[in-house]
Amino acid sequence: MADPNLPIHSTRLPQITPGSSLSIREDVAFSDAQGKERPRLRKATDKTLSRLQEILPRVLQPREVVLYVFGAQAPISPLSQWFLGWHVYGFTRTILVLTNLRLLRFRVRGRGWNRWEWNQGVQSVAFADLSEAQVKGFLSPQLVLDYRNGHKERYWRLRRSDAKKLKLALPTLRMNNTGPVSASGGMVSLCPKCLATLTPNTYRCSHCGQVFKDEKTLRRFLLIPGGEFFYVGQHSIGALHGLVQAVWLLAVLAVAAGFMFGRRPANLLSVVLPSASVALIFTVHKVAGFFPCRQLVREFIPLK
């Protein structure tokens, strides 16, 4: 277990914020990779921490201090990223908190221009459960995490200043957190109500009974245009995709109705092939939307 006063910068002494509800290492949280304090970084970090005030103080363990806070995009498959287009930035937005013991991830959602709020999702991985943690890339830095259970995740769209800071801090933190590997050996989801570790694919907390949205219901929502996105709370994406899907569905139904009740055309292929093509596009669109939504469901979305 790493000491809360573990030195990160050779040029600065450890400094923990006094008299605060959160224990923050000011020498790390508010400085750049060279250890020089940046007022703009302090202001941005304070704003981020204030928006996590509902959950972060509850998550922190005794002798656990906040070292650094930064934003990133959560892991997502290239196909889903291509399918979502520019919506992917809101879909995968996440806040990561580096402490002396672990890396915390908080799922967030946008609230207007440059505003966001915590979206009831919290995950955690201890440094002992990481077989490797590297920052890769220059123009578009990524945080690549290799877990002891064999899984790998990439958090992308890091700011360069954050990437430099992580390159400095992560080796020291991993070197000083060499405890036993947990049963999961990787990132785990925590119940936002009681903070118990949640079991993958079990959508009820065994400790407090909190119920979460599940994959079975998500599949039923596929029957509604844009329903998969509405189910996971992505309403703006759901409205856009729902409109497109509704138009495609109406086109197929209109052709089918005309074929059944109207005059049949001499060349059936001229009707069947375009209709089948639209139906195929509709199905592919639904399947492509299902996978990123299923990923959110597997990160546990509480039922109110």
Which residues does each PLM region occupy?
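Anionic N-terminal interaction surfaces
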Residues: 2-96
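Conserved long hydrophobic alpha-helices within structured protein cores
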Residues: 65-68, 93-106, 239-245
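Phosphoinositide-binding peripheral membrane targeting modules
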Residues: 75-142
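Canonical pleckstrin homology
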Residues: 93-94, 120-123, 127-177
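Beta-strand residues in well-ordered beta-sheet regions across diverse protein folds
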Residues: 99, 106-107, 146, 206, ...
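Transmembrane helix recognition focused on a "late"/terminal membrane span
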Residues: 139, 143, 161-221, 240-304
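A short amphipathic helical element positioned immediately N-terminal to and/or at the very start
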Residues: 219-231
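Membrane-interface helix starts
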Residues: 230-241
